[in-house]
From Swiss-Prot:
Organism this protein belongs to: Schizosaccharomyces pombe (strain 972 / ATCC 24843) (Fission yeast)
Identification of the protein by name: Meiotically up-regulated gene 14 protein
One GO CC annotation: cytoskeleton
Disulfide bonds: none
Pfam families linked: Aldolase_II
GO molecular function terms attached to this record: actin filament binding
Subcellular location: Cytoplasm; Nucleus
Entry annotated with the keyword Nucleus: yes
Gene: mug14
Length: 257
């Protein structure tokens, strides 16, 4: 069994790229296993470790559950395909993500899916309540992007979404769904799955209780939990059981680097 704690270090950036693409493909398989797919909607962008002005993104025609490293598409900052599988990808999605990468240069990965509970909760136009300790990683750590009535360009949509994200790790895009960011694919993917479950839990609680009956995590405790949990090593480590599961189920299409 591979070591799952701590971020790996690489002397060779080509090896790091191979590692990154395996983890990216595994994240998509996890999204598919959890039912986060909606047709061709949903995309992940990852900054390339060799040329940091270029990115990797998923192709439109490959199902999340079947994603392989060789399927992923390498593009430059203008959205031009420069390598990888060279299959068609969501150009509008990249235009939005690119603006977020520009505003937050420390962000390596941006994840966005059209998951059921994320879409449902986003329609409320409000942030998550801290109703359990797991979701406290999002305490004062997620924003809201309120969709405007006007029709705008994708780059402008990206700039507005980036404003909603601010310095946080996640943003709820009203009537649309969840976006998360991280310094690794694993961090962003884990945060996305955690936010999706947190939306599900809050919707369950909202349907079963009156406002005054709910018990919130005390702000002091919520802040302490976030400060302890919200770090690149811890969030990367939290995703590794999911990664190893997808490798084991991949019939050799994914590998541990």
């Amino acid at each position: 069994m591979a070591k799952v704690t701590g971020l790996p270090e690489f002397e060779d950036l080509h090896t790091k790229r191979k590692w990154m693409l395996n983890h990216m493909a595994a994240a998509f398989r996890m999204f598919g296993r959890n039912g986060y797919n909606e047709g061709t909607a949903g995309h992940v962008t990852v900054r390339d470790p060799i040329d940091e002005n270029t990115f990797w993104i998923n192709p439109l025609e490959v199902p999340f559950s079947l994603m392989k490293p060789s399927d992923l598409v390498h593009i430059n900052s203008d959205g031009e395909i420069i390598g990888g599988s060279k299959m068609k990808y969501n150009t509008s999605g990249f235009a939005i993500h690119y603006e977020m990468h520009k505003v937050r240069p420390e962000v390596i990965c941006v994840c966005h899916v059209h998951s059921i509970y994320g879409k449902a909760f986003s329609a409320l136009g409000k942030p998550l309540d801290m109703l359990n300790t797991d979701c406290c990683v999002f305490y004062n750590n997620h924003g809201i992007y309120f969709d405007m009535d006007d029709v705008i360009s994708m780059p402008e949509e990206g700039r507005r979404t980036a404003k909603g994200l601010a310095d946080y790790k996640a943003v709820l895009v009203q009537n649309h769904g969840i976006m998360t960011v991280g310094t690794t694919v694993d961090e962003a993917a884990y945060l996305l799955s955690l936010m999706e479950r947190s939306c599900q839990i809050q919707l369950l609680i909202d349907s079963a209780t009156k406002v005054g009956e709910r018990k919130h995590v005390h702000p002091t405790r919520a802040k302490a939990i976030r400060e302890n949990a919200d770090n690149p090593v811890g969030l990367y480590t939290a995703q590794q059981p999911n990664f190893l599961y997808e490798v084991a189920c991949s019939n050799g299409e994914l590998e541990i680097i």
